Design a protein with these regions (language model features):
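Conserved AdoMet/S-adenosylmethionine-binding subsite of the radical SAM
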Residues: 5, 17-157
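Active-site beta-strand/loop signature of hydrolases that rely on acidic residues for catalysis
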Residues: 13-14
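Conserved alpha-helical substructure of the radical SAM core
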Residues: 1-10
Length: 157
């Protein structure tokens, strides 16, 4: 704030919550002085009370079977009004799996977004067409990946 910088800071990386008790809380609280703090997480680890005080939003990305890993969702997140959920999907079967996941864990549908798994603009458009109707049927939002539309999978954009 002393530099005149304000806004929204996203703490991301493999899994930021592995740094609980090792500086993450202090970092988040210091960043909070600059504006809103969002933490991206798989949802496996719950935040500490100290971290939760300094975080405005959790961007929770539970893993579906298309990710090739099984990671349990901690019960903190479905009940937190700060948590928003993003599922990476490639087809109707993934949408069905995400909808079942949301239902089974009591995640509010209004806090759920589906994001196309794609690396090129052409693939992105194709995935959007494949998932759209299933998303509507389940009352789930779809968020496009505009950087893929603009630049494909180019780094640094």
């Amino acid at each position: 704030a002393s530099l005149g910088v304000t806004g929204h800071v996203v703490v991301t990386g493999g899994e930021p919550l592995i740094w609980l008790g090792r500086g993450l809380e202090d970092l988040a609280c210091r960043l909070r002085e600059l504006g809103a703090v969002e933490v991206e997480t798989s949802g496996v680890y719950p935040p500490s009370a100290g971290l939760d005080r300094c975080v405005d939003y959790y961007d929770v990305s539970p893993k579906l079977s298309n990710a090739g890993v099984k990671a349990p969702l901690h019960p903190f997140y479905p009940s937190s009004p700060k948590a928003w959920f993003k599922f990476v999907v490639r087809d109707e079967a993934d949408v069905e799996e995400a909808a079942a996941y949301v239902e089974a864990r009591g995640i509010p549908r209004g806090r759920v977004f589906l994001m196309p798994m794609a690396e090129t603009p052409e693939e992105h458009s194709a995935v959007l067409r494949r998932i759209w109707d299933a998303a509507l049927r389940h009352g789930l939002r779809v968020t496009p990946r505009l950087h893929i539309e603009a630049w494909g999978n180019a780094r640094g954009k």
